[in-house]
């Protein structure tokens, strides 16, 4: 009687983000991106990172229109609904929007960024 040994192998590959900046970390009131700590909401896109003042700062989001296919909006610790006016403006500009809590938005952004997708994220800090 012989015993078969099954060996599972996990393949690891280095993730290459090119010149884009992934979210390296986050915590209460901050994000770490590109080695810098941002103590505010942020907008990340293929062109860089900048401060985001929240839902009333719709001009910064609308400016992403031609550069992206999807915008991930992280609403902080908990998922919350976007103001209807903001949703209407983004949809009117042809921007696909996915709303989730900020930790989920960070992870999703990083995965799709590593795949070279045309995405951006607008993130509010967690509590």
Residues covered by each model-derived region:
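Non-catalytic interface/targeting segments
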Residues: 2-58, 114-126
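Short glycine-/small-residue-rich flexible loop motifs, especially phosphate/cofactor-binding loops
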Residues: 28, 84-87, 109
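Short active-site-adjacent helix-start/loop capping segments
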Residues: 51-53, 79-82, 107-108
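Mid-chain, well-packed structural core segment of small domains
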Residues: 65-100
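C-terminal structural segments of small proteins and small subunits
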Residues: 96-124
């Amino acid at each position: 009687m012989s015993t078969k040994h099954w060996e599972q192998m996990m393949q690891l590959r280095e993730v290459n983000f090119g010149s884009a900046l992934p979210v390296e970390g986050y915590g209460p009131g901050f994000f770490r991106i590109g080695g810098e700590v941002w103590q505010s909401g942020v907008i990340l896109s293929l062109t860089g990172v900048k401060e985001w003042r929240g839902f009333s700062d719709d001009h910064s989001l609308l400016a992403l229109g031609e550069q992206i296919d999807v915008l991930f909006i992280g609403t902080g610790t908990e998922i919350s609904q976007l103001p209807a006016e903001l949703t209407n403006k983004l949809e009117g500009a042809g921007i696909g929007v996915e709303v989730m809590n900020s930790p989920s938005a960070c992870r999703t952004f990083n995965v799709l960024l590593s795949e070279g997708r045309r995405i951006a994220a607008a993130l509010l800090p967690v509590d």
